[in-house]
Amino acid sequence: MKKLKMKISTILILLLVFVTGCSSKKELKDGVYEGNYKDESATVKVVITIKDKKIVDCIREERDNKNNQIKDENYGKDDADFNYKQAQKAVKNSEGYAKKLVEVQDIEKVDSVSGATVSLKRFKSAVKDALNK
């Protein structure tokens, strides 16, 4: 019985150490970092400024890989009206991601906005690329 308790205790301690080690947040170093993410349909570039170990600014740019067009207020104008409206909904809904990152200081705490879920996945990947440099 003592051996079983000892094994269980050891496993629990190792599990606690592992979980604690995995949850520790990487300390940010001051500077300006650029990150990129590219998939078959879009490329995202972010420029993140760190000051006093905090994210103080984030600039995000997303481009359509088909025509290299920046996804802004003009994105989708050459398409049918429905496609333009859908494109603009995604653009509008994803605009807040950079601001939210500065606010919450953790990319995993930036929540998806309806109509811009794919943009968030791309943004998160670009941010992780920048912060891992």
Where are the predicted features?
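Bacterial N-terminal signal peptides that target proteins for export
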Residues: 2-9
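Cell-envelope/extracellular anchoring and linker segments
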Residues: 14-16
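Active-site- and interface-proximal helix/loop "cap" or "latch" segments in soluble metabolic
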Residues: 26-28, 34-133
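C-terminal motif of bacterial Sec signal peptides marking the signal peptidase cleavage site
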Residues: 18-21
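Compositionally biased regions
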Residues: 10-11, 24
